[in-house]
């Protein structure tokens, strides 16, 4: 951070003025889409809603756009994204502040077959996932949640109790002749 500040100070005309102009344009022209929660340009529309040429049957629900980008970069999911804009918390964020109602609308409107809840393994993330599951109970949509447990390359001795508990609870059967 110090190096960045020094670089900006030493190259004020070259870097700071164009950066300030760009930030002002972003502030003026980029907002949050009311339907999916992604970034929306006043000039081009929503990246998620406008550019979808495929007809998907799944929606992956994430807390913020950084979560969407991580999942997209993994190339593991093909479908729509829905960005909540946070999680339900006991201090601050309320369920009304999140885009849960628009998720239910999208599920009904777009004939979504599965909603994948990709919220954090925190108390707030799990509370939010439970609330979404409850909000979708009157639809015919399958609601799933990402598995939790041991991270790839993780050492057992360095894991916290919650991760170990989740790993034991969500363990897989390795016998091929049974479920």
Pin down the residues of each PLM region.
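Cys/His-rich Zn2+-binding cysteine-cluster or related metal-binding knuckle/ribbon modules and their
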Residues: 2-68, 173
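Solvent-exposed alpha-helical segments within well-ordered globular domains of core cellular machineries
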Residues: 2-6, 17, 21, 34, ...
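Extended interfacial segments that mediate partner engagement and assembly in macromolecular machines
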Residues: 51-119
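Short, solvent-exposed polar/charged micro-motifs at secondary-structure junctions
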Residues: 48, 93, 154-156
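Long C-terminal interaction/binding lobes of large macromolecular proteins
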Residues: 11, 77-78, 104-179
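Conserved phosphate/pyrophosphate-binding and hydrolysis machinery centered on Walker-type P-loop NTPases
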Residues: 13, 26, 39-42, 93, ...
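Residues at structural and domain junctions
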Residues: 9, 19-22, 57, 89, ...
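Sequence-level detector for tyrosine residue identity
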Residues: 27, 56, 80, 130-131
